[in-house]
Amino acid sequence: MEARIHQIYTMMVIPRCSVVSWTSLKKLYLGDCALSDESMAAILSGCPVLECLTLDTCGELKVLDLSKSLCLRTLDIYPYSWVPGPTQILAPHVHNLILVINSQLACTSFDVSYLAEARLEICIFVLNNVEAGFLQDVVLKMLEKLQNVEKLTLGGNFLHILSLAEVRSVPFPKLKVKDLTLKTLIFQYVIPSIERLLQNSPDLKKLTVRVKSSNYIRDYALDDYLELQGFNPDQCWRSKDGVSFNKVGCSIEPKHVTSLLELVLKNTKTLDNIAVIFDERYPSFKLEEVVVPTLSHKNVSIALLYNQTDP
């Protein structure tokens, strides 16, 4: 019976210091759990061949130590706005990471020595000025830890916070990413971060932009923060060469897609493929209306697509 168990789903309060013996378990999902550090350690010790772990809205957990889980390769963590995730993660054997950061109590320390692929996003609905400053520090430290990751996916809220850091001229780490995916609407509030990410990814081969409504931070919150820092928002959101983009994501026009493609081509040297994949609600124009730019010294494949499966 135990040998046939490959996956367990549970939504409960896990008693402190629970003892389990799931010696054949390879995939574990824990959702809506009040999970202490001691309980998590006990569960992990009873799952010696665990390969995949998902923590979905697990409160109380502060330190997630996976250093003794030698077989663990995939880790997914999803907190919620009022249920923070762990603030310390030790996952030296994990190769694939999905991490959604809680805006109020984000993970500030993590070891992911052998990580090959990461997907990062921020769970936030209302941004205040204190969180804006705190999150900039958090996301930049995370990127620094992920310098050797070759496949990276960033969500719209994550890009917003990176844009604030770029406008303020905060240094960005260099990345070794070869395959970069951005899940965001195309509008002015993500342009500074996209431009800097491209410039700091000299080995980039493939860029995918999944145009979808995942940007939940309000534009006025971003503008208000910059004004308090002494910046003029109307001047901050342009690209380095002065190109202006749409202020509202749903008001995207063909020229804005063209401008984005031009920005990508100007800021990359090794890129082979660009794919811009639109959610079925965006855009309001036909993709044939987009003028696809070309550069004589670059041979880059550019594809504009609809309704691809979102992994």
Map each language-model feature to its residues:
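Non-core capping and flanking segments associated with repeat-based/extracellular domains
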Residues: 1-311
